[in-house]
Amino acid sequence: KFSIKKKDDAAAKVGEDAQNAAAIKAHPLLSRLQLGGGLSTVGYASVRDTAAINKIIYSAVAKRLLPSDLRLLWSAQPADNVKMKNIYELHALKVTTTTGRAPLEGDVITDAKDEFDQMGSPVVSMKMNTEGARKWAQMTKANVGKAIAIVLDGVVYSAPRVNGEIDGGNSQISGNFTIEMTKDLANTLKSGRMPAPARIVQEEVVGPTLGAQSIQMGIISFVVAFVLLMVYMVMMYNIVPGMMANLALLVNVFFTLGILTSFQAALTLPGLAGMVLSLGTAVDANVLIYERIKEELRSGKGMKQAVAAGYGNAFSAIFDSNLTSLITGVILLTTGTGPIRGFATTWIIGIIVSFFTAVFLTRLVYDYKLNHDKWMHCKFDTAVSHNLMQGKKYKFMSMYKTTFTVAIVAAVVFIGSFFVRGLSKSIDFTGGRNYVVQFENPVEPEQIRTVLGDAFVNADGSKATTGAIAIGTDGKTIRVSTNYMIESNSPTVDDEAETILYNALKKANLVSQKSVEAFKNPDVRQGGSIISSTKVGPSVAKDITMGAIYSVLFALIAIFLYILIRFRNVAFSVGSTVALAFDALTVIGFYSLLWGLVPFSLEIDQTFIGAILTVVGYSINDKVVVFDRIRENLKLHPKGDRQQLFNASINETLARTINTSTSTLIVLLCIFILGGDSIRSFSFAMILGVVFGTLSSIFIASPMAYIVLGRKIKEEPAEEAAVAEVK
């Protein structure tokens, strides 16, 4: 009997589940939304069901069936009159204006604060200006006994009942509030003190497929760069030192990811680029230490003494170069926008972590092994790197007139190109809209430019500026840019621009979507669609332009002051700042000369400004290392011939310069080739910066410091001139 009853119960439960499933399928809204509530509240739902309900109430069918003046919005906070947690209210609001906007907006509120009423309950008091007070009196008089909703960002913060006409502009909002809720509501109301209603001045929409592809490309470039760096370190510094450097790289990655996870930071492509570049920074520290250890071993010291001296002598160069890069990273973080801040965050974390892993972590391992008489005969070179650039006596200082002449001619050419060809400015600096459109079949950008040439016409009858460039190598992805009606505040302009784009491409048989809604949907790829879009208003474009100029100037000034403080000589500050300015000019100049001639975009945007600042931060590394060696030799030989001393210092650091530049170029080439189109322009600027930044350290920064410092002093005795060149 028991078994029969158990089977009957199970069958009944299965039947009940089937009935529930059928009911949910037949009435999906009623199964998730509990009706009732009174006043503006039409129902309650769990937070986990809101997404499913939104698909129903915001669907095309709902738009046709529901009244046109009805708006359904969720509450900002969970309801407090239900027993379950995370239950939100659904409010039904009536649109009372022809424009669809609220009859009263936040600009009429002059003050709002959280207080307590006579019963000691938390309330919010607000005060309006004269015009707001007049309209508020009219609204409250016409809606006694009804609710008036306070809405921000599409959610209802409060919907209090109107008990009577309120004049004078002073009102009190009461309800079942907590102190935290009244503080939040007061701050929300005070945010309405802006001089004009808020409108979208900058927007970026990325389709999920495009975003996934970008992240995948970033991860691939990161993994490939990491593996190549590991191979390079072993190839240049042998098994044990190479693997120790690789261990430091691995710990660097884990620490960086751990810190990002603790901050709950989202993984973005610029953030991945920052991580990849931080690998180059980590390698630089290890290269400095290993080159110093090799010098100490060549001087006849034992392994223990050589390792201790190598770490000790390399510390100042590592500290100064990392700190100058950190200064640039902080400037990027404080002055940049979303993508640049993401890059700066991971780069800053990488700089700090690489300093810890290179200077302290690997030192602990070496000390432990050497104290136990292990690794006493460890080799820090291989057949490839043995005596690399050792004993060279290049006379760099005697070439400064020639190199300065070449630099001046190049600067004139770059500046001339600015006036003749200009720069390919993105909407970040001009204002406008970008649409990345994926077509079914390959299409030429020139064809798109022809099709859209007369499509976008501004309200005054003038033609909007329109452009198109290819994205990727398949020929199916085109980025369309236009400044159509960018000055307009109308909320319908965005839809108008997308409709114009769709109609023009549809007429030319370039897309086959049956509606503009399908064309705008990034998930509907068949027939062609917009997979991402960006909008920048003219005010934001002006702010970005000025912010870019200020950030670069501020970076140069900050580095000038830091070098002055650390090296206590204006000659090094002048040399480094002039060279850094030339590095920035060179990168910008090549972008002016090459845009339109290379098969990838060279637009000047916020990412490019981030690249310029990164070039400044990276380039100063090499200059600091060279200057640190010059400073060291000046202390050892204060009366030595300075031309010979400068030449010797540069020659002594050539091996480090070559290894660091090569390892960084490996990383950047991985980003450039594998990182995707969205980061290619950034990596190209960095490649130019590394190449010309390295050259400027030798041929501009050092000679400039040499000239300012003074060339002729009394030569020291021959026995003290060990570092001098033999003429």
Outline where the language-model segments fall.
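Pore- and gate-forming transmembrane helices of large, multi-pass membrane proteins
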Residues: 209-229, 281, 301-337, 395-397, ...
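Juxtamembrane "pre-transmembrane" interface segments
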Residues: 169-172, 180-227, 500, 504, ...
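Transmembrane helices with small-residue packing motifs
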Residues: 389-441
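Cytosolic juxtamembrane regions of multi-pass inner-membrane proteins
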Residues: 280-321, 367-375, 592, 598-660, ...
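Interfacial segments of transmembrane alpha-helices in multi-pass membrane proteins
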Residues: 124-125, 129-144, 148-149, 212-267, ...
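Hydrophobic alpha-helical transmembrane segments of membrane transport and translocation systems
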Residues: 258-259, 295-316, 320-407, 647, ...
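Small-residue-enriched core segments of transmembrane alpha-helices in multipass membrane transport
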Residues: 242-264, 275-282, 343-358, 573-595, ...
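Non-transmembrane, solvent-exposed regions of membrane trafficking/translocation machinery
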Residues: 1-161, 542, 546-547, 563
